[in-house]
Amino acid sequence: MGRIISPDALILVAVMTQLRDLEIARLFGWYRIPLKTAPKVIAVDYLAFYQTGSFGADKWRIQYIAQVKGHELTTRAELLQDQPDHPRVNEEYYKVQIGSLQELLPPIPAGKWRRITFFYTTGEYLQDAETVNDLIVHSEDRQILWTALRERLDKEQTYGIGDQPEVELEDEVLAALLGIQGQ
């Protein structure tokens, strides 16, 4: 797939740490996010999967995206029933239902980046990205992105999130809320 996606699509760049997680996404159509480390808004249009060092030759890149179909809160025990003795078996996770994985051609390499946590971007940035750094929303667009995410949050009424006040935020605060570090 090329990178033809709506420019205003909301995208969450999510970390894929294991090949097994990629297979779960491909075969069963879901991705898990621990509630305690989840970003503020899960109700986005797409997930873009950043593949870590465990992916061998395909490491440190975004190779796949998937449309988000919905999400629910559950436990790790319910998601991964073959791991009843896992230390986090009773912790809560978002189970994000996704459509089929779409391969990005070419994939988006990390470049100098290696350690990535969740962050938001848009379809416009994804279309033009040559490296992961190109997905970082510029200062002048951060307020627009944050407003779109807040509107989505209000519409979806996600778990445990109350009304959010309308305030103008400084760029550093916006960057932190969007998962952007050191930019």
Which residues does each PLM region occupy?
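Structured alpha/beta reader/binder surfaces that contact nucleic acids or chromatin modification marks
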Residues: 2-183
